[in-house]
């Protein structure tokens, strides 16, 4: 499993904080960030890398998290969530089988961002009754 990270200009500093934290925690991290990219291009790059292996997860950071979330939900087979707290990050893995989260650098600070990333990557899909909802989401794109 690899954690794919990406950010636009407004999210780059926080992305580096999260990336370094995940590396310290022992995760393989793939950074697809390129200078000058818009959040649309960054989100598409993260999703492309996430979709190479069904175990991969993605984190996109921009100023508010909303833009990358809108992009991610347009990608066939991608379940994504915009999160700003640890519980939501954890639960979106467990109940929605989300493979990507988006975070706003102007919404959360460094420590919260690290906790969000940790909760997300350590979350496991519960399956069962939640699969009906995941199937419904996957039929939409």
Curated annotation (Swiss-Prot):
Signal peptide: none annotated. It comes from the Bacteria. Induction: By lactose or galactose. The operon consists of lacABCDFEGX. InterPro entries: LacA, RpiB_LacA_LacB, RpiB_LacA_LacB_sf. Coiled coil: none annotated. GO terms for biological process: D-allose catabolic process; galactose catabolic process; lactose catabolic process via tagatose-6-phosphate; pentose-phosphate shunt, non-oxidative branch. It catalyses: aldehydo-D-galactose 6-phosphate = keto-D-tagatose 6-phosphate. Its EC number is 5.3.1.26. Keywords: Isomerase, Lactose metabolism, Plasmid. GO terms for molecular function: galactose-6-phosphate isomerase activity; ribose-5-phosphate isomerase activity. The keyword Cell inner membrane does not apply. NCBIfam families: lacA, PRK08621.1, PRK12613.1, rpiB_lacA_lacB. Belongs to the LacAB/RpiB family. This gene was sequenced from pMG820, a laboratory-derived deletion of the naturally occurring plasmid pLP712. Heteromultimeric protein consisting of LacA and LacB. This is Galactose-6-phosphate isomerase subunit LacA.
């Amino acid at each position: 499993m690899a954690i794919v990270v990406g950010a636009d200009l407004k999210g780059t500093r926080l992305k580096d904080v999260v990336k370094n934290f995940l590396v310290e925690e022992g995760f393989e991290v793939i950074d697809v960030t390129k200078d000058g990219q818009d959040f649309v291009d960054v989100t598409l790059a993260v999703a492309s890398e996430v979709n190479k292996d069904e175990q991969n997860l993605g984190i996109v950071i921009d100023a508010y998290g909303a833009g990358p979330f809108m992009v991610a939900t347009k990608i066939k087979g991608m379940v994504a969530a915009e999160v700003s707290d640890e519980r939501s990050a954890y639960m979106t893995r467990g109940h929605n089988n989300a493979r990507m989260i988006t975070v706003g650098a102007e919404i959360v600070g460094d420590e919260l961002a690290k906790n969000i990333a940790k909760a997300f990557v350590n979350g496991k899909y519960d399956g069962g009754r939640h699969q009906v909802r995941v199937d419904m989401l996957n039929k939409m794109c």
